Curated annotation (Swiss-Prot):
CDD domains reported for this sequence: PTH (cd00462)
Lineage: superkingdom: Bacteria
Quaternary context: Monomer.
Organism: Escherichia coli O17:K52:H18 (strain UMN026 / ExPEC)
Name of the protein in question: Peptidyl-tRNA hydrolase
Site note Stabilizes the basic form of H active site to accept a proton, residues: D94
Alphabetized UniProt keyword annotations: Cytoplasm, Hydrolase, RNA-binding, tRNA-binding
Gene designation: pth
Amino acid sequence: MTIKLIVGLANPGAEYAATRHNAGAWFVDLLAERLRAPLREEAKFFGYTSRVTLGGEDVRLLVPTTFMNLSGKAVAAMASFFRINPDEILVAHDELDLPLGVAKFKLGGGHGGHNGLKDIISKLGNNPNFHRLRIGIGHPGDKNKVVGFVLGKPPVSEQKLIDEAIDEAARCTEMWFTDGLTKATNRLHAFKAQ
């Protein structure tokens, strides 16, 4: 099993670019930069896309330009066009249930209230069995404050921790293709930015 599509979840537009909810897109942007494969808008996939080679494998990158709760439209369009199965997809997203400075790989599971994941599961035929990269953004402590929190911009001190976790996650994702998922997971899950 290899990953053929890496997706970074986000809301479109300048007003959302620096918000916590866009952490998944920050990850794919960094990966595209590291692999010198600039993302370009591609209307038929409802997002910015690029094609990279990782460990000799042909991999597509995608940042949907739909709103977060319609992310599945872009993912399903690309998966269908390139005949990519759910278990060949890695979706990077912001994760309230992980602390700042931490990122973790996970296969399958629920959506945990994340509207992007919810729509992807639905558009993949109610199939939750895709890989996720959960990027810790911390939790505001009160569930009534969650919407404002994820759509807010982290202060510089928090942004630094998120960026460091994303940087390590990019290295570990590349490692996944060369050394396997177990090794990459062990390294990523041992990391915590200080």
